[in-house]
């Protein structure tokens, strides 16, 4: 892997991990349309850890608050919200492997992501969500968690689904986004742990270590930038802007699928 490839892959992962456009969906699209090979597993794990650093930097105040008061309501909400994704990853992941080979699945899922983003914005403007952590119920956390679990389908954005679910549930706009990003921490850590055994097998070539440093660093920087962009758009009620992007990419994806 070259340094340029590492930079591009890190940037794409950092941006699409947090922008509501589906990182897994874009990976499938790039592999099919641009014939880009899937990166080595070790690189993939390290890049995901780079995005984890971005979350820690962006939300350190929230994380530090949880560490100081681990039994606060936000902690319990995050635990409850992670349960559906944990069950889905453990029980259903093998059944979704073929979805990562299908442009049709990605195209349809991107259409659904766009609809979800647009719908949530319209609903949130009608009921003016004001729920902060203390007012958010465990049923709200489960609902958000279920949407996160469904994002195992490539093309269905994890960040988009969880933010949209929070808005639909009546959460305060900024808290909905913060909760979504904090909810990504256990998911990213869990995915990294799940792949660690294979990482020890593949390893890193001693003469090719620089790309494995540049990739995660790039992912962290672009991931932090993406988080700030999403937070700003959510505050201003402009999340639905990404709906149009998802629909355009979905149209291109389905067109390419029909050509095949």
From Swiss-Prot:
* Main subcellular localisation: membrane
Molecular-function GO term, any one: undecaprenyl-diphosphatase activity
Q: Could you tell me where this protein is found in the cell?
A: Cell membrane
Gene encoding the protein: uppP
GO terms classed as biological process: cell wall organization; peptidoglycan biosynthetic process; regulation of cell shape; response to antibiotic
Q: Which UniProt keywords apply?
A: Antibiotic resistance, Cell membrane, Cell shape, Cell wall biogenesis/degradation, Hydrolase, Membrane, Peptidoglycan synthesis, Transmembrane, Transmembrane helix
> Which NCBIfam families has this protein been placed in?
undec_PP_bacA
Span-the-membrane segments of this chain are 40-60, 76-96, 99-119, 181-201, 213-233, 239-259
What organism is recorded for this protein? Syntrophomonas wolfei subsp. wolfei (strain DSM 2245B / Goettingen)
Q: How does it sit in the membrane?
A: Multi-pass membrane protein
Entry protein name: Undecaprenyl-diphosphatase
Quote the EC number. 3.6.1.27
Lineage runs: Bacteria, Bacillati, Bacillota, Clostridia, Eubacteriales
């Amino acid at each position: 892997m070259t340094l340029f490839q590492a930079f591009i892959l890190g940037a794409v992962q950092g941006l699409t991990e947090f922008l509501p456009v589906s990182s897994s969906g874009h990976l499938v699209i790039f592999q099919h349309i641009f014939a880009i090979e899937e990166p080595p597993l070790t690189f993939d794990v390290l890049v995901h850890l780079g995005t984890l650093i971005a979350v820690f930097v962006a939300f350190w105040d929230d994380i530090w608050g949880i560490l100081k008061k681990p039994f606060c309501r936000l902690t319990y909400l995050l635990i409850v919200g992670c349960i559906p994704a944990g069950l889905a990853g453990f029980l259903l992941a093998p059944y979704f492997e073929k979805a990562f080979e299908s442009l049709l699945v990605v195209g349809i899922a991107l259409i659904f992501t766009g609809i979800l983003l647009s719908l949530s914005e319209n609903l949130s403007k009608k009921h003016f969500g004001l729920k902060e952590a203390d007012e958010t119920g465990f049923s709200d956390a489960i609902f958000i968690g279920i949407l996160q679990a469904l994002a195992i389908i490539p093309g269905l954005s994890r960040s988009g689904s969880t933010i949209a679910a929070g808005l639909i549930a009546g959460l305060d706009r900024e808290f909905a986004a913060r909760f979504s990003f904090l909810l990504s921490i256990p998911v990213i850590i869990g995915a990294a742990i799940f792949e660690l055994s294979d990482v020890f097998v593949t390893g890193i070539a001693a003469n090719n270590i620089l790309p494995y440093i540049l990739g995660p660093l790039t992912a962290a920087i672009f991931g932090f930038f993406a988080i700030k962009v999403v937070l700003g758009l959510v505050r201003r009620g402009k999340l639905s802007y990404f709906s149009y992007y998802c629909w355009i990419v979905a149209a291109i994806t389905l067109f390419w699928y029909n050509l095949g």
